[in-house]
Amino acid sequence: MSKYEVLQGFYAVHDELGSGGFGKVRLATHLLTNQKVAIKIIDKKQLGHDLPRVQTEMDALRNLSHQNICRLYHYIETEDKFFIVMEYCSGGEMFDYIVRKERLEESEARHFFRQLVSAIAFVHSQGYAHRDLKPENLLLTEDLHLKLIDFGLCAKTEKGRIDKHNLDTCCGSPAYAAPELIQGLQYKGNEADVWSMGILLYTLLVGALPFEDDNMQIMYKKIQSGCFYEPEFLSPLSKQLLRAMLQVVPERRISVKKLLEHDWLNHKYTQPVKWNTIYDKNFIDRDVARVMSKYYGFESTDKMIEKIKEWNFDYMTSTYYALLHRKRNGMEIILPMVRNSTNTAPPNVQNILCSPTIHASLENNLDKSGLEDDDSDPSSISSSSDISARLKKNCVVSDESSSSRFVKPMSPAAEKDKKMSYVNAMLTMPSQFTGRSPLRIPESPMSVRSSDSASLGSAATPSRGGVKDNDKENASTGKNYRMGASTCKSRGPLKITGVEEGTMKSVYTTPNTRPTLRGLFSPGNAEHKKRQRARSSDRASIGMPPGSPVSIGSAHSANNELLADGRTPRSRIKTNRLPQRVFTSLERKKEKLITLLTPRKMQRDSPQVLKDVKNMVNVSMTASQDPEEVRNLLKKVFDDERMRYELNGWKFLATQETVHGWMTVELEIVRLQMFDKVGIRRKRLKGDAFMYKKVCEKILQMAKIE
């Protein structure tokens, strides 16, 4: 029995993205659409008295649908677990971006902070207070859009009266908590969130915490004093804003309304921050609904729309969001033609909490005022996948022109240029602090091609020829290529070309140059296909050593009768080794089938190969070309620092005890094909973000790999 039986047939669960006190977050694939999602798995036994927090988080996520808040797709409750399926943010944690650049330029910090203020202004307008704002709860999409997560500690008040309601629960992370929380006083949620945003802004601009100490009591005293260091490189406007947000007395603290109008926040922007949601719960994309109606067997698109509007947050809701994500990224909207009759949910899947939510896109309201305008909706790099004619006959595809209210996708080339203009500007901007950009070296003009995602073997799995997933992930996803893979994507028999004519071709010899492989059934091979059988006996006799099984069989067949057209009967040219040859053929076909159905694996003696790391802010490039050397250096650092670690191939899982608890980080040695260098991919699995930053910087510095 599977560990996550309730997810079988709906999601394929992959690597761990992170963990907390009550559960883990795993990367997964939505099987019907092949889109990546994140699944938060919470153990009820570990929750104990905190069980109501999950219900609070679910209520918040259903109602807080905003462009800068991570979207809820699907909610499943079983006897012992909660499964929260959410939008996957492939850009990783915001803190990885800070670790990569050490601190951000003010224009970069402004880009992200405007999005955070937009999200919090909307949260407060709906009567919620987040109460746990910290870098770990800020994620990035592949196009550097910020998404707020983790509403487990949020507080709900009457809508529009958050500034009138007092709270008394002390919660959140100490380094980001407001003074009134530390003192145990009653507080207002909106004022506490403004303080935490001030800490985050300081972190973005300086790369450090304003109030920090290994001794918790000393750190509390620093927070209550409100005194913090102001580096000289900060502009007067940024200093003014930080002082206004980090006021010890809550009544003197700047309000969110005034924060939205502050000069620093709107510097070089043509429009103020748009904090209202761009989604409308009453608007459903008709293209997506039409495809879903054919799959689910609804009589009309309108019937499907009415069903989606129930917002049950079941697999149907998840499918709608996944297809909507494909459309927004210029990918084809496609589902199998007929719903599999065996694709029924297990009984415990039916135990799903249901409630309406705000959603649906009003993309035309986005701010299009320029590169720095944060509210614009950059499209994805991903282009539409190539769908064969045979597949299209068996699949449902949207056939309506883009006449709906949803923005029509641009051409793949235009989409890529539009998005990369800003992403590259952000990632290649040199830092004043370090003097280098996150990439640190020029881009290579090499082309990038996505690979297939892992095979999905279940009743609900689309056919193998389905649309490829063009999402870009930090984890092992479509853009990660591995060395030593022996698979070949050509279909059917292969013809070897590129060998000089006139040279004797023996099946036991290898050409000096690497041959070109091409499918035998391509248009250019029509004549070859007609002549193939006629030359089968000739192939066996050319270049064979005397006495070999093939040459003996050929000599024997020469004495047999010929057919009317002069050809030798196929049965006559076979030898008494036929059973063995048939068995060998079957074995080879079995190996090929296994190879096709198994994801590419890296060789044990080679690290994983990454073809493209442009948007991977959690990858550090080394000066070395020898992965073994880097691995030995990391081992030495871990031993010198007396850090516990486990080594699995090229992946380190290191842990260290800190004043804030245990810190767990994953470091994987990879090969950067674009630059012909060895890199290190970082991932924080558990612990405080700043401790993660310190540990990573210390390890990379001591290993002398930056």
Curated annotation (Swiss-Prot):
> Is the keyword Kinase in the record?
yes
Residues in KA1 domain copies: 656-705
- Asked if Nucleotide-binding is a keyword of the record, the answer is yes
Q: Which InterPro entries match?
A: KA1/Ssp2_C, KA1_dom, Kinase-like_dom_sf, MELK, Prot_kinase_dom, Protein_kinase_ATP_BS, Ser/Thr_kinase_AS
Q: What does the UniProt PTM comment say about this protein? A: May be phosphorylated at Thr-169 by par-4 and/or autophosphorylated which likely results in its activation. Phosphorylation is not required for co-localization with the centrosome.
Q: Where is the Protein kinase domain?
A: 11-265
Residue positions annotated to bind ATP are: L17, G18, S19, G20, G21, F22, G23, K24, V25, K40
A GO molecular function term, named singly, is: non-membrane spanning protein tyrosine kinase activity
Q: List the disulfide bonds.
A: none
Effect of knocking it out?
A: During neuroblast differentiation, mutants produce an additional precursor cell for the HSN/PHB, I2, M4 and PLM/ALN and Q.a and Q.p lineages. The nucleus size of the 2 Q.p daughter cells is similar. Symmetrical distribution of myosin II during QR.a cell division. Abnormally high number of ADE neurons. Double knockouts of pig-1 and ced-3 have impaired cell shedding during embryogenesis which results in the generation of an ectopic excretory cell and an ERM-like neuron.
Impact after mutating G198D: In gm301; production of an additional HSN/PHB precursor cell and an additional PVM precursor cell
Report which reactions are catalysed by this protein.
L-seryl-[protein] + ATP = O-phospho-L-seryl-[protein] + ADP + H(+); L-threonyl-[protein] + ATP = O-phospho-L-threonyl-[protein] + ADP + H(+)
One GO CC annotation, please? cytoplasm
| Region called Disordered, residue ranges | 366-386, 433-493, 506-555
Keyword annotations for this protein, in alphabetical order, are: Apoptosis, ATP-binding, Cytoplasm, Cytoskeleton, Developmental protein, Kinase, Neurogenesis, Nucleotide-binding, Serine/threonine-protein kinase, Transferase
- State what this protein does: Serine/threonine-protein kinase involved in cell autonomous neuroblast asymmetric divisions that generate one precursor cell and one apoptotic cell by controlling spindle positioning, myosin distribution and the segregation of cell fate determinants. Plays a role in neural fate specification in several dopaminergic linages, acting in concert with ham-1. Involved in phosphorylation of multiple proteins associated with key developmental processes, including the cell cycle, apoptosis, endocytosis, and asymmetric cell division.
Family recorded in the similarity comment: Belongs to the protein kinase superfamily. CAMK Ser/Thr protein kinase family. SNF1 subfamily.
In Swiss-Prot or TrEMBL terms, this protein is called Maternal embryonic leucine zipper kinase
